[in-house]
Regions:
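Terminal amphipathic alpha-helical/low-complexity segments used for targeting or macromolecular assembly
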Residues: 1-51, 57, 75, 87, ...
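Compositionally biased, low-structure terminal segments
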Residues: 6-8, 15, 181, 188, ...
């Protein structure tokens, strides 16, 4: 594709680097951009490829690449060696940084951050003050919201909700239609699949495995080498190991 933008001549310093305001040279119908529209800020022409666009006061800088029909808007920042592709939207005050890769139809919004070497693909929504970082992989129809944290080497696939102050970290593997609510914590090498629900101050950790429709709530703990499956409710101060 021929070059689809130019520098307007406006520039400013952003976090120690000079960034340039851009202007569209061609229509980008899928993004509702027409030739002549003024966009956001980039450090170099290499920051935008294909028909990707940056608008408002958003910034794409350093070695970051925004590709395909992805859009960066609002006051969002894409930096480092991050790659944003597909039909991804990064907006509001969100940040995608370091070596993170966001693809598919993901939306990163609010004050959320995707950092480290995190890989995000599919219909993923990361919003509010959520953080996704380190070597995490998210793939599927996943929502990470409010103050939730997904970090470490966690692998999360399927139709998963991580919200409130929930944390999913370390080497855990999550799949299916799992929900993490409240102050729930899942860490260690835990494995959870099916339609499980972890909520309140519950914890699942070490090598515990949950399958089926297990619900862990209140201050219950499931850990050690425990394997729980079927339609089970673990509550109160229960300690299963």
């Amino acid at each position: 594709m021929a070059k689809h933008f130019e520098f307007t001549g406006d520039e400013r310093v952003f976090e120690g680097v000079t960034v340039h305001r851009i202007r569209a040279l061609v229509d980008l119908p899928e993004l509702n951009v027409v030739a002549g529209d003024v966009g956001g800020w980039v450090e170099s022409e290499d920051n935008l490829a294909e028909s990707a666009w940056v608008m408002d006061e958003a910034v794409v800088c350093q070695d970051a690449r925004v590709m395909d029909s992805a859009v960066v808007s609002g006051n969002a920042v894409v930096s480092g060696q991050a790659k944003v592709s597909g039909s991804v939207v990064v907006t509001d005050n969100a940040q995608v940084a370091d070596g993170a890769k966001v693809s598919g139809s993901a939306v990163v919004s609010g004050q959320s951050q995707v950092r480290g070497k995190a890989k995000v693909n599919g219909s993923v929504t990361i919003m509010d003050n959520a953080q996704v970082c380190d070597d995490v992989e998210l793939a599927g129809v996943i929502t990470v919201s409010v103050n939730a944290l997904v970090c470490g080497n966690a692998l999360v696939t399927g139709e998963v909700l991580v919200t409130d102050n929930a944390q999913v970290r370390d080497d855990v593997e999550i799949s299916g239609k799992v929900k993490f609510l409240g102050n729930a914590q899942v860490f260690g090498s835990a494995l959870i699949s099916g339609s499980c629900r972890i909520e309140d101050d519950a914890q699942v950790f070490e090598h515990a495995e949950l399958y089926g429709r297990v619900r862990v709530k209140d201050r219950a703990q499931v850990h050690g080498s425990a394997v729980v499956y079927g339609k089970v409710k673990i509550k109160g101060k229960s300690n299963v190991h």
